[in-house]
Amino acid sequence: MTIATAINLENMTTGEAKLTLDKVIKQIAQRENEELLVAHEDIVIIAYALENNLQLRDYLMGLTRDGLSVESVAGILTVMVDLFKSAYRSTYTIETVLASYVYRLGDSAGALVLLANGLARDYSLAKLLLRVFDQGLAPDTFAMMSQGLHGKVVEELTRTQELLANEANR
């Protein structure tokens, strides 16, 4: 007999959330036209973490520094949007991050569409990206800025890995 247990999101650490995020990114990146099987609990954890931890969200903004192409990251995040939807989770965080990669690919119109959900929620990153896009910042410049911050974000995630993922000062 199997007993289902609820995920205790309130007690999840930043380190645990990052491990789950990295695991799912790897699963998506390594699949080759195979059916993707991601645990529902993993999607719930990631959705919660991205809504409650700015460092984890910002970590996604610099994934190209970890050796992935802009196209690959955009593809991974697109799959994650679909996974969030299939798990009935809010998509505004992942769509906003995806908008930054779509912008880097030169599709400003597509990036603006992806920001809509975040802007409707008054999401700070969506508002910041809208200002960046409206100012016409070159995608290459934006990419360099994001990559430049990634090392600092990773350092902060390492430093705070034992803290709760929803720590109040995030």
What role is predicted for each listed range?
Residues 1-169:
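Charged, compositionally biased boundary regions
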